[in-house]
C-alpha cells in the first residue's frame, strides 16, 4: 500500500511540473473567487477509539494543507488527505484544512482512550488578575462532571471560579496571588467513576502594582585619591523582570565597574544587588551616581554622591564667639564643631600650655556612617578669676593638624596683688581684675586703720596696665607721699563694674622724721588659723555625710498599693501589715548548709527543715537572714518583707513563704528552695545545647546530643549557684511531658526525682521551654498585680527555676550584692537597674503596674537572647538616657518568634496606658504554647494544694482587695498525700 501511495505522490508532482511548464487548461481562481474547502467526514467533531484509523479528506479546487494542533503544538502536511493509521490519545486535537486563498475549515477529533482521559500540559503558570488555562483537554467528550479538584481532597479556595472546555481545558478566572502553589487536578466522571488527571501546581506571577523599591548602602561618600569607592544598590520588586542599572549624572563615561547579583526571597519578593566599584578613585571621579530601576508600572531611582579630595582635611567651626565673657563663679561650655576626613586621630584641649585631661568630650554629630562632622565640648564649671585666658582646641588626622583658640575673660572684682612703700618715697599698688580696674588714692588725717572720711582723690604720679596670662588686666599705680606733713592714712582704692577693694598705708611723724610705713593687714594670724580649721572641719563633715548617704539603703522591692490617684500611687506601709504567728517554726529544727547568696545586709542559706511536712520528714528550704553587722533599719526591712510575703499568699510562680522565726533570736524567713538557681545563669549554661524548635519530635535528638556531651551541671552539681546535692542517677530517654510532669506539684513538697527521668538541667533547651518560661512569669506577675503588688525589679536574675522547669518570681533584696553588680547603676543615692526600668521610672521615679510590664518586656528580650544583657554594648550614660527619651527600642532577639517580639514592643510603649496588662499577656502567650505544655502547666497548678486562683482585674478594682487577704494557715505545710 505504501508503494502505491508513493507512486501516486510521484505522479502528482510530475503533473504539477507539466502544468507549470505548459500552462493549465483550467484558469486559476482569483482572490475573490475562493471558497471554503470541504472536509469529509462533514462534521465539526469526530470521535474515534484508540488504535483506529483517522482518515480526513479535504476537497478544494486548488492546493491545500492540513494543520494539526493540540496543547499548543502543531504539525502540518501538504496533502489533501490526512491519515493516521493507529490513533492514540495524543492525536486528539483540532485538524484544519487551509486552501491557497487562506480560507480554512476545521474538524476536532477525540481519540477515546480508556487509559488516558486527559491530555496534560505542564507546568501551569498564571498571572495575577488574569485568567489562566489549565491545559487538560478531554479525549472523551461523553464524560460528565468535568471540573477542578484540590489535591489530597483539600477544598479549592472559596473565591476560585472556572469555566470548562473539553477541547481546551479549564480556565481559572481572575487568578489571585493567594492561589500560588495551589495543587490541582482536572477531574471527570466516566461510567460512574471519578477520574483525576496528573497533578498541576499553579505558579502565580504577581501583578506589578508599584514601582521597584530602590535603596543604596550609603547616600554620600568622601574619599581621598587612591581609595576604593564601593556602593551597593538594592532593588526589590515582585518580579525578576525588573530592569536596573547605574548611571553617572552628566557624565556617561566612568571608571566604575558594576556587578550584579540577584535572588528570590519567598514567592513574591525579588531582590537584586547592583554593586558599583572604583578600585582607585580620582578627583575627576567625583559626581552623582544614580541607581535606576524600572518595571511595567514605572521607574524609581536613588542617588549617591561621591566626593574625592586630593588629601585629607580638617575644618573647625567655633559655635560661639572666639572671645567669651563670663562672670566669676559661673559655668561656661566651650563648643566647637569640625569636619575631618580621614577620621580624627587625636583631639585635646590646651589651657596655658597645659593639656586638660578631663571636663571635655568629643563625639560624632550624628550616627550616620558617612558622618564627617564632630563636636567637641569643654565644660568649665564655677570659673574663678584666675581661670580665664586662652583655651585652644587641637585636632589632627593622618594628613593635617588644625586648632582654634578661644579667649575667655572672667569678670572679677579687683584684687590688690601688692601694696608697698618704696624707698624713694613712692606708694605703689598693683591691682588685677576684669574689666580693667580704676585705681584712686585717698588721704585722711590720723593714724586710722581705715579712712572714715577720705580726702582726695590724690594726684596719681604714674599708672600703667598690662594683661596677665589668665586674661586679667593688671594696673600698676603709684603716688609720691614725700610731700605729706601730717600723720595720716593713705587708701589705694581699686574698682570696676563688678566690685571694689582697698588697701591702706598709715604713718606718723616722730620729731622731724617720718616713721617707716607698713601695709595694713585685715586679718590677724589667729583669725586666719581659726577660719582654716573651721573650713577643714566642714569638709570632713561633708565627706562623712556624703559617704553615709552613698551607702545603699536596703528596702523591700515589692510594694503593695493602697490607693491610686491618677499616676500617684499610695503604698501600704509594710510595717503596718499584720503578721500571723502561725507561720512560726522552731529554730532548733533548722540545719543550715551552704550560703546561696550574700549581699551588703544579709544572706540566703540552704537549710534542712525537720517536721515542716510531717514530724519525721526533712525538707530542703532556703532561709533568708541578716548579717550580724545589720542595723535596725535592715531588721525592720526584713520583717516588712516577711509581712509582704505572708500577705500575698501562695502561687505556683512565686517563691512562696514556708515559715519564719521571729522570736528568740534574729529574724529568719523560710522560703522554697529552687535547685536550679536563677534563670539568667540557667539560660547562659544552655546556650550551646539550645534547639531552635519547639516541636516535640526533636526531643530525642536533643537528648542524644546531651548524652554524648560531658554532663552539664544539674541539681547534682555542687559547682552551680543555688544548687542542691544528690547522688547521680541512671538515664532513659524521657519526653518533654515527662520532664515537666516529674515535678508533680512543683517544689512545694521536696521528693526524690525518679531515677528513670533525666534531670531537667541535663535536657537541652528549646523554644517551647522559652515560651513556657514567658507564660509562667506572666502568670506570676498577673497574680502579684491581682494582689496590688508592684515588683519594681523584674529581671531574669530575679527568677528562680525548680524541678519541672517551673519558674518562680522572687526578690533577692538583701541577699544581692548590688554594689558589685554592674546591672545596678548609681543614680542619686541609690543603685537602680536602669536598663530594666520604664522611662517614667527613670525620669520621674514613678513605679506602677505598667512599669512592671515594661520590665517584663526587657525580661522577654533576655529570655529569647538566652541570657544576653539588654541594650548590648551600650553604657548607661547621658546618651543612653537621651535614646530612651527619643523612643529607641531594641531589635528582636535572635530566637524570638515574631509574635513574642510583638508582645515586647507593646510592653515598651512610651504611653504606659497603652501597654497590655499581665492578664492580656497571659492570653497572648497561651495562643503560642503547645497544647501539651499548657495541659501540663494546668495540671501542676491544679494539683498544688490550697492554690488561689486570682483574677487579674483592672488596676482601679484591685485596690478594693488590699488588706483583705491574709493567710491564717501555712498552706505549704501539708502532708504528701494531700
UniProtKB/Swiss-Prot annotation:
Extracellular side: 26-525
A GO CC term assigned to this protein in UniProt: receptor complex
Annotated site, Important for interaction with phosphotyrosine-binding proteins, chain positions: 937
Subcellular location: Cell membrane
Location of Phosphoserine modifications: 742, 747, 822, 892, 961
TM regions (residue ranges): 526-546
Ranges where the record places region Important for interaction with phosphotyrosine-binding proteins: 569-571
Glycosylation site list: 94, 145, 284, 294, 301, 321, 353, 368, 401, 464, 487
Binding site for ATP: 597-604, 624, 672-678, 797
Xref: Gene3D superfamilies: Immunoglobulins, Phosphorylase Kinase, domain 1, Transferase(Phosphotransferase) domain 1
Ranges for domain Ig-like C2-type: 27-112, 121-205, 212-309, 318-411, 414-508
Topology versus the membrane: Single-pass type I membrane protein
Similarity remark: Belongs to the protein kinase superfamily. Tyr protein kinase family. CSF-1/PDGF receptor subfamily.
Function: Tyrosine-protein kinase that acts as a cell-surface receptor for the cytokine KITLG/SCF and plays an essential role in the regulation of cell survival and proliferation, hematopoiesis, stem cell maintenance, gametogenesis, mast cell development, migration and function, and in melanogenesis. In response to KITLG/SCF binding, KIT can activate several signaling pathways. Phosphorylates PIK3R1, PLCG1, SH2B2/APS and CBL. Activates the AKT1 signaling pathway by phosphorylation of PIK3R1, the regulatory subunit of phosphatidylinositol 3-kinase.
Note: Numerous proteins are phosphorylated in response to KIT signaling, but it is not evident to determine which are directly phosphorylated by KIT under in vivo conditions.
Name recorded for this polypeptide: Mast/stem cell growth factor receptor Kit
Organism, scientific name: Felis catus
Species lineage: Eukaryota, Metazoa, Chordata, Craniata, Vertebrata
Amino acid at each position: 500500500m505504501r508503494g502505491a501511495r508513493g507512486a501516486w505522490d510521484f505522479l502528482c508532482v510530475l503533473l504539477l511540473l507539466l502544468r507549470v511548464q505548459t500552462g493549465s487548461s483550467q484558469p486559476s481562481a482569483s482572490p475573490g473567487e475562493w471558497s471554503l474547502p470541504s472536509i469529509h467526514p462533514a462534521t465539526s467533531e469526530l470521535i474515534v477509539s484508540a488504535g483506529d484509523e483517522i482518515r480526513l479528506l479535504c476537497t478544494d479546487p486548488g492546493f491545500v494543507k492540513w494543520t494539526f494542533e493540540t496543547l499548543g503544538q502543531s504539525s502540518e502536511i501538504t496533502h489533501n488527505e490526512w491519515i493516521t493509521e493507529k490513533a492514540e490519545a495524543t492525536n486528539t486535537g483540532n485538524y484544519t484544512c487551509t486552501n491557497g486563498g487562506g480560507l480554512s475549515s476545521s474538524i476536532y477529533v477525540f481519540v477515546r482512550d480508556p487509559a488516558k482521559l486527559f491530555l496534560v500540559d505542564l507546568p501551569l503558570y498564571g498571572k495575577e488578575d488574569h485568567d489562566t488555562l489549565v491545559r487538560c483537554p478531554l479525549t472523551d467528550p461523553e464524560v460528565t462532571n468535568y471540573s477542578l479538584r484540590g489535591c489530597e481532597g483539600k477544598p479549592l479556595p472559596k473565591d476560585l471560579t472556572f469555566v470548562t472546555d473539553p477541547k481546551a481545558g479549564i480556565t481559572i478566572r481572575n487568578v489571585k496571588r493567594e492561589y500560588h502553589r495551589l495543587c490541582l487536578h482536572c477531574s471527570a466522571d466516566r461510567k460512574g467513576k471519578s477520574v483525576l488527571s496528573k497533578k498541576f501546581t499553579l505558579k502565580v506571577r504577581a501583578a506589578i502594582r508599584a514601582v521597584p523599591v530602590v535603596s543604596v548602602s550609603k547616600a554620600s561618600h568622601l574619599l581621598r585619591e587612591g581609595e576604593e569607592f564601593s556602593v551597593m544598590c538594592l532593588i526589590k520588586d515582585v518580579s525578576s523582570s525588573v530592569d536596573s542599572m547605574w548611571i553617572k549624572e552628566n557624565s556617561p563615561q566612568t571608571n566604575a565597574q558594576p556587578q550584579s547579583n540577584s535572588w528570590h526571597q519567598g514567592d513574591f519578593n525579588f531582590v537584586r544587588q547592583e554593586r558599583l566599584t572604583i578600585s582607585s578613585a580620582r578627583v575627576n571621579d567625583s559626581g552623582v551616581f544614580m541607581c535606576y530601576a524600572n518595571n511595567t508600572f514605572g521607574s524609581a531611582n536613588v542617588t549617591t554622591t561621591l566626593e574625592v579630595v586630593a588629601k585629607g582635611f580638617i575644618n573647625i567651626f567655633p559655635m560661639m564667639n572666639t572671645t567669651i565673657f563670663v562672670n566669676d563663679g559661673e559655668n561656661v561650655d566651650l563648643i566647637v564643631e569640625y569636619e575631618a576626613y580621614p577620621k580624627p586621630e587625636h583631639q585635646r584641649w590646651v589651657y596655658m600650655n597645659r593639656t586638660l585631661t578631663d571636663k571635655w568630650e568629643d563625639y560624632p554629630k550624628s550616627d550616620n556612617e558617612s558622618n564627617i562632622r564632630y563636636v567637641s565640648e569643654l565644660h568649665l564649671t564655677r570659673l574663678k578669676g584666675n581661670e580665664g585666658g586662652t583655651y585652644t582646641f587641637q585636632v589632627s588626622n593622618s594628613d593635617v593638624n588644625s586648632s582654634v583658640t578661644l579667649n575667655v575673660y572672667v569678670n572679677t572684682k579687683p584684687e590688690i596683688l601688692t601694696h608697698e612703700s618704696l624707698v624713694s618715697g613712692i606708694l605703689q599698688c598693683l591691682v588685677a581684675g576684669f574689666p580693667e580696674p580704676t585705681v584712686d588714692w585717698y588721704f585722711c588725717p590720723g593714724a586710722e586703720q581705715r579712712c572714715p572720711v577720705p580726702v582726695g582723690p590724690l594726684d596719681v604720679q604714674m599708672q600703667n596696665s598690662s594683661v596677665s596670662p589668665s586674661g586679667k588686666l593688671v594696673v600698676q599705680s603709684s603716688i609720691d607721699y614725700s610731700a605729706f606733713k601730717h600723720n595720716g592714712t593713705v587708701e589705694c582704692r581699686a574698682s570696676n563694674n563688678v566690685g571694689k577693694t582697698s588697701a591702706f598705708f598709715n604713718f606718723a611723724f616722730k620729731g622731724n622724721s617720718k616713721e617707716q610705713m607698713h601695709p595694713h593687714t585685715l586679718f590677724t594670724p589667729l583669725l586666719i588659723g581659726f577660719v582654716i580649721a573651721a573650713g577643714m572641719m566642714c569638709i570632713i563633715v561633708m565627706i562623712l555625710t556624703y559617704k553615709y548617704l552613698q551607702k545603699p539603703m536596703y528596702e523591700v522591692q515589692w510594694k503593695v498599693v493602697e490607693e491610686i490617684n491618677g499616676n500617684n500611687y499610695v503604698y501600704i506601709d509594710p510595717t503596718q501589715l499584720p503578721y500571723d504567728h502561725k507561720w512560726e517554726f522552731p529554730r532548733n529544727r533548722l540545719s543550715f548548709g551552704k550560703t546561696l547568696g550574700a549581699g551588703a545586709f544579709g544572706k540566703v542559706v540552704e537549710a534542712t527543715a525537720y517536721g515542716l511536712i510531717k514530724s519525721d520528714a526533712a525538707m530542703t528550704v532556703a532561709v533568708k537572714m541578716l548579717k550580724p553587722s545589720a542595723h535596725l533599719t535592715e531588721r525592720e526591712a526584713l520583717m516588712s518583707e516577711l509581712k509582704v510575703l505572708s500577705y500575698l499568699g501562695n502561687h505556683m510562680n512565686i517563691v512562696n513563704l514556708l515559715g519564719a522565726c521571729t522570736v528568740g533570736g534574729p529574724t529568719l524567713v523560710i522560703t522554697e528552695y529552687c535547685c536550679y538557681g536563677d534563670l539568667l545563669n540557667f539560660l547562659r549554661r544552655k546556650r550551646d545545647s539550645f534547639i531552635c524548635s519547639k516541636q516535640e519530635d526533636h526531643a530525642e535528638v536533643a537528648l542524644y546530643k546531651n548524652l554524648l556531651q560531658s554532663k552539664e551541671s544539674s541539681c547534682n552539681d555542687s559547682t552551680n549557684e543555688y544548687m542542691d546535692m544528690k547522688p547521680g542517677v541512671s538515664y532513659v530517654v524521657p519526653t518533654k511531658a515527662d520532664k515537666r510532669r516529674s515535678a508533680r506539684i512543683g517544689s512545694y513538697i521536696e521528693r526524690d526525682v525518679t531515677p528513670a527521668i533525666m534531670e531537667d538541667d541535663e535536657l537541652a533547651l528549646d523554644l517551647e521551654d522559652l515560651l513556657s518560661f514567658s507564660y509562667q512569669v506572666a502568670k506570676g506577675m498577673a497574680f502579684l498585680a491581682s494582689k496590688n503588688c508592684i515588683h519594681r525589679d523584674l529581671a531574669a536574675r530575679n527568677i528562680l527555676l525548680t524541678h519541672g522547669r517551673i519558674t518562680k518570681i522572687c526578690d533577692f533584696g538583701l541577699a544581692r550584692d548590688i554594689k558589685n553588680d554592674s546591672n545596678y547603676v548609681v543614680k542619686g543615692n541609690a543603685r537602680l537597674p536602669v536598663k530594666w526600668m520604664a522611662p517614667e521610672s527613670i525620669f520621674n521615679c514613678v513605679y506602677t503596674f505598667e512599669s512592671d510590664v515594661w520590665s517584663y518586656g526587657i525580661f522577654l528580650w533576655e529570655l529569647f537572647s538566652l541570657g544576653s544583657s539588654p541594650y548590648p554594648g551600650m553604657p548607661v550614660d547621658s546618651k543612653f538616657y537621651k535614646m530612651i527619651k527619643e523612643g529607641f527600642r531594641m531589635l528582636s532577639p535572635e530566637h524570638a518568634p515574631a509574635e513574642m517580639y510583638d508582645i515586647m514592643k507593646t510592653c515598651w510603649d512610651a504611653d504606659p496606658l497603652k501597654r497590655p496588662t499581665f492578664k492580656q499577656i497571659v492570653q497572648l502567650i497561651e495562643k503560642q504554647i503547645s497544647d501539651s505544655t499548657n495541659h501540663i502547666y494546668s495540671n501542676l497548678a491544679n494539683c498544688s494544694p490550697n492554690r488561689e486562683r486570682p483574677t487579674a482585674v483592672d488596676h482601679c478594682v484591685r485596690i478594693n482587695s488590699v488588706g483583705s487577704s491574709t493567710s491564717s494557715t501555712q498552706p505549704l505545710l501539708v502532708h504528701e498525700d494531700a
